[in-house]
Amino acid sequence: MNTLQKGFTLIELMIVIAIVGILAAVALPAYQDYTARAQVSEAILLAEGQKSAVTEYYLNHGEWPGNNTSAGVATSSEIKGKYVKSVEVKNGVVTAQMASSNVNNEIKGKKLSLWAKRQNGSVKWFCGQPVTRDKAKAANDDVTAAAAANGKKIDTKHLPSTCRDASDAS
């Protein structure tokens, strides 16, 4: 008796399921990194929106703005986005803090900074891990890595290549 088999055998189905599982295991971490980078890009975009106000304040007053109000921008809690809790200007350093909910777990509550230094009569901007500047006075361009930033730094793999400057960059 010759029977004609139609469809897939159990072994064939198990092999297909195993292949799909392996592909999902490889793709999921890459997707998580992609979503974190996309969320960090919102923080950079909001922080970069404050650069012109900080630069203008510096060029007009000869010192860095001490806070959001003196820079002429909205308060830190008013500058926010879907993934960004706040953007603060302090002594010319613009720091964005990620939100603590609806954000990739690897970047929850973490920070990044944009800061400027005088260079040949103009202002050059840098972007990277959180930094602080002690004083707003024009003679002080130095920034230091934020002391309380341990555990609050965004992993370098989630920062775009244009935002990986060290605090001692010049």
Curated annotation (Swiss-Prot):
This is Fimbrial protein. Disruption phenotype: Deletion mutants are unpiliated but nevertheless form biofilms showing that attachment and accumulation of cells did not depend on pilus expression. PROSITE patterns: PROKAR_NTER_METHYL (PS00409). O-linked glycan has been reported to consist either of the Gal(alpha1-3) GlcNAc disaccharide, or the Gal(beta 1-4) Gal(alpha 1-3) 2,4-diacetamido-2,4,6-trideoxyhexose trisaccharide. It is found in: Fimbrium; Membrane. Glycans are attached at S70. Residues 1-7 form a propeptide. Disulfide bonds join C127-C163. Belongs to the N-Me-Phe pilin family. Major component of the type IV pilus (T4P) that plays a role in cellular adherence, microcolony formation as well as twitching motility. The modification N-methylphenylalanine is found at F8. The modification O-(sn-1-glycerophosphoryl)serine is found at S100. It holds the Pfam family Pilin. Keywords: Cell adhesion, Disulfide bond, Fimbrium, Glycoprotein, Membrane, Methylation, Phosphoprotein, Transmembrane, Transmembrane helix. GO terms for biological process: cell adhesion. The chain crosses the membrane at residues 8-28. Its main location: other. GO terms for cellular component: membrane; pilus. The pili are polar flexible filaments of about 5.4 nanometers diameter and 2.5 micrometers average length; they consist of only a single polypeptide chain arranged in a helical configuration of five subunits per turn in the assembled pilus. It is a single-pass membrane protein. InterPro entries: N_methyl_site, Pilin, Pilin-like, T4P/T2SS_Core.
